[in-house]
Amino acid sequence: MYRIEVYLKSYLPDAKGLGLVRDICDLGITAVSNVRVVDIYWLDADLTGDELESICRNLLADPVTQEYQYGQDSQGSWVTNESYHVIEVAYNPGVTDPVEATIMKAVRDLNIENVKAVKTAKRYIIEGQLGKHQLEVICDRLLVNPTIQHLVKQESVIFPGNPQYSFKLERIDILKAAEAELLGIRQQFGFTNDELEAIVAYFHKRERNPSDIELETLAQTWSEHCVHKTFKGKIKFGNTTIDNLLKNTVIKATEQLDKAWCLSVFEDNAGVIDFDGRWALCFKVETHNHPSAVEPYGGAATGIGGVVRDILGTGLGAKPILNTDVFCFAPPDFPYDKVPEGILHPRRVFKGVRAGVADYSNRLGIPTSNGAILFDERYVANPLVFCGTLGLLPKELSCRGKQSPGDLIVLVGGRTGRDGMHGVTFASEQLTDESARISSSSVQIGDPIVEKKVMDILVEARDRGLYSRITDCGGGGLSSAVGEMGAETGARVWLDRVPLKYTGLSYTEIWISESQERMVLAVPPGSAEELLNLFVSNDVEASVIGEFTNDRRLQLFYQGNLVADLDMEFLHDGRPQLRAEAVWQQPDYAEPDFACPLELNEDLLRLLSSWNVCSKEWVIRQYDHEVQGTSVLKPLVGKNNDGPGDAAIIKPVLDSRKGVVVSNGINPKYGDIDPYWMAASAVDEALRQIIAVGGNLERVALLDNFGWGNTSRPDTLGALVRAAQACHDMAIAYGTPFVSGKDSLNNEFEFGGRVISIPHTLLISAASVMEDVGRAISMDFKQAGDLVYIVGITNNELGGSEYFEAHGFTGNSVPRVNAHRAKELMDRLSRAIEKGLVRACHDLSQGGLGVAVAEMALAGELGATIHLNSVPLGGPIDREDFILFSESNTRFLAEVTPECSEGFEEMMGGLQLAPIGQVANSETLEIYGLDNRRVVAISLRELKEAWQRPLRW
């Protein structure tokens, strides 16, 4: 065994190390002067000196910036003396090492065949006088996540052997089990009482006990994550009973609208709409919350990987063309001493999630072009990580495929290991301070290089017509993928034919593993050889593991033994419908009792520096949004490309002028007051952003993603009902159907007798077809002398606003939506932009008018003069701060040239709008109050500094 160390040349700055110095300083440890990071590689190999030199020189080290050394000393160490400390960190046994497969292939490409295995680690050389406790704090909070990593000590075994598995069929006695035993089984598998009773009755009729793999299959199929049993349950809400909340709200709106351009909704891995008659678009947003809480990097990376595979598995396979990401964290400056035991600090979660999404998306070659980041202390134990992907596929291939009995079940992509075990049941549960330890096998570490190869080959296989149906192997693993594909036919699987990462997996582990980068295909026997050869020729594994039948049974075999035999009808339709009661009562919060400040400079700067409003450029710059060459309007816009764009626009078909606008809406603080208006506001915000960049409402597809607490509590469930009802009402009013969605429930954390529940959170994502991308506009001011119009009504609606939050209040006047008036306003503004009457447009959201005009000014590097007494009001408001920071919905700022003002006002048809100021050839934003007294005068430099400083990491 060889140990190779690769490190930067001594005269070069270590960017990773400098970042760690800053992070260590944030912990309150100031004695660290420098950190150097060394890459460690262990090779289990029999190599000549020349071969070892070739691997180091040609593969592992960059001769321009790096040096290397090697030897046969396999031992890492924790070395410490007065001036420096050495710490090594490696992956735990069984955790996928993402670099290992790449190195193994590269070594083979060097014609070196004697490398059996590779492991990697990081060595941190920390300079400074530190005590043992300080080192432990640094390791615990920054360097080691015990879920997937460990400190390398002298006694560490680098290449532990994997035990062989000896087959033994495990049966679980449920027919004669006592009440206490049944309770244990129910808790182990996550069944409800009614569900376990149905299972007992099923096996009683068959006069046998279930095998462990049969119960695992039922637990996966009936999990909240997979079947959405709360949304599909029977809910008593007041005097009404709602039979299937999903069908009676979100899906009902889509059915009522009955848009011909909706090609596939709520039946495939993603929603599909017509793009141009030749091509179709598909869109899906998933959550990966619990895994990201336990291991942020891997959880977020596999979240992106999973939703990309959803797109690959839509219709007969789509090409991913854009990724989105929306994160909800606790504030990065959350006090360390208030972080509950068993969870990671929000700053570490934030950085890990960001890195996971960036690394996976960038390596897949998919632009990450739209997203949002929100902060609330209640996300401290349950971050929300929403990952979305937009795909493009031929319209004639947009409907879900259909296999025939006799078609082969082919597994392609990555190998199967223990990573991701029980992921869907883990995602359906409430977290505790033991979750990281108990559920460590639920975390997956993805390999984007494998997924990239799978992605490229599948498009070719699709175009050759080599398979009849496709789906991703994600949550629930083969159990979910094969179980769902075979629901209408039946399936027979030989589990010992599944390629494994290592030996020792039981038949059950093979079946429920959620190892990444895998897809399942239904392949006609006549196409199998060509398909297998195609994958092998591109260095991707493909294996025939079973066949589809015509008996509607799921039969699983291992080494010739029948280990599972379930009726598909019971598996998919035998689950008892959940019954629950929901209540909702309007809360009553204290109203603000502070006086209106005489001048509002400090308040505006404070809002620009708030975590929810401040620039997210540090995150955005680490995403590649230019790859594939389709970008039209980017996440950052303006004179220096550092202003906050409202939505992303891409041109996916290069010989067409048509584009796709992608946006989102989310504001959980409104849900504290009324989840109905929170949901309505999220829909309105997503649509506002489309209009602001030049889109329209003619062909907009919506997606819903609910992040909620424990819905077994009636008040929490009642809030969910309110939000779902608003989704229906807004979709109907705007004429914008929902095409896909996902819910993530039980986002709570229990410790020491306390429960932390996340705020009610609804993400609305939107994709709109734009007829001509040449009509796109951005939000930055363009020319001094232009008029600044406010479009829409400003009301005294600051409940849940950033301004009230900054003063320690919630309030009750939550922003509402007049959707019918809003639709007319948006339609008219859209036509005005299309006619070229608007130079710049920005929607008003968090921070209201004050933040919006400041963002337009700093992005365009042009000052402005604004008059609050010209703002159209829906009722009397006698406070300048309330007018400036109101968050009323359906409002825009529009920059219009004086020559176009008359045409603009005529186009708007007398709807509530008014010129409230002018763009100025100055470096100052000036705002005048109700009595024409100046209440804001801030330089553009101060505005930008306040806005950019918080996340200038």
What are these model-derived regions, one by one?
Residues 1-10, 37-42, 81-93, 122-124, ...:
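Short glycine-/aliphatic-rich beta-strand segments at the starts of folded cytosolic domains
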Residues 19, 23-79:
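Acidic (E/D-rich), amphipathic helical modules within compact regulatory domains
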Residues 1, 12-25, 104, 885:
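Long, contiguous binding/interaction regions
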Residues 35, 109-123, 127:
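Interaction-mediating elements
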